[in-house]
C-alpha cells in the first residue's frame, strides 16, 4: 500500500503537468450577429433575408420610387405630404346564415384570413330588425382592416392575380368612388385568389373591398390607383382618362339563313 506522502507527490505532479480548462466566457458562447436578416418574434415565423423581404413589397416600392414623382408632376404638389396614398383597405363579407351556421362562419373566417393574411373579426347587428328577422348582437358577417405592408401585399395580389382570374373580366368600374377619393369594389367569388383551393371551397362567397385613400378628389384617387395598376374599364362616368382595359364588343352569331342572333 502506497504511503500518504507518495500519493501527495503523485497528485501534485499530475496537476502540474495538465493545466485546468478555462471556463468559456459568455461572449464566446454567443453566435456572431446575423446581417441582412429581418428579425421576428418567436411566433413560429422563420427568419427571412432582408433582400427577399423587400422584393415582396414591390407595389410599395413602386409607389415610393415611381408613383409619387408622377403624381407630383401631374397635380403640381408643392409638399410631398400632399401626394395621395392608400391609407387602409377594409375587406368585409356578409353571411346571411351566420347565426344558424357556425361552421359556415368559421370557414368564411378561415378563407378571409388566408386571403388577407390577417385574422378577421365578426360583425354584429347593432339593433334588432323584425322585418329581416335580425336580433341585436347577432353575427352578420366578418370584416378585416389592413394597413402597412399587409395592405400593399393584398392590393398587389388583388390587382395582378385575383381580378384577371375573374370570369369574363372586362375591367373595374371607374364610377365607384365616393366623392372623396375612396374606391369600393366587389369580388363575387373568393376562389379567384390563389390562396384558396377550388376543391376546398365549400360554398362560393363574395366580398367587398373598400380602398381608403388620402386623396381630396375622385380624380386624384383614380389616378393613384391607375398608376398602381388598377384595371379601370372604358366609360362608366370616370373623372379621369386613366383607362387600362377596354370593354369588349359582343359578337354576333349567324344561323344558316343569315339572320343575326345575339
Curated annotation (Swiss-Prot):
Its main location: plastid. InterPro entries: Ribosomal_uL5, Ribosomal_uL5_bac-type, Ribosomal_uL5_C, Ribosomal_uL5_CS, Ribosomal_uL5_dom_sf, Ribosomal_uL5_N. Keywords: Chloroplast, Plastid, Ribonucleoprotein, Ribosomal protein, RNA-binding, rRNA-binding, Transit peptide. Residues 1-39 form a transit peptide. GO terms for molecular function: mRNA binding; rRNA binding; structural constituent of ribosome. The keyword Cell division does not apply. GO terms for cellular component: chloroplast; chloroplast envelope; chloroplast stroma; cytosol; cytosolic ribosome; ribonucleoprotein complex. It is found in: Plastid, Chloroplast. Pfam families: Ribosomal_L5 (PF00281), Ribosomal_L5_C (PF00673). It comes from the Eukaryota. One of its GO terms (biological process) is translation. Binds 5S rRNA, forms part of the central protuberance of the 50S subunit. Belongs to the universal ribosomal protein uL5 family. PANTHER family: 60S RIBOSOMAL PROTEIN L11-RELATED. Part of the 50S ribosomal subunit; contacts the 5S rRNA. NCBIfam families: PRK00010.1. This is Large ribosomal subunit protein uL5c. The gene is RPL5.
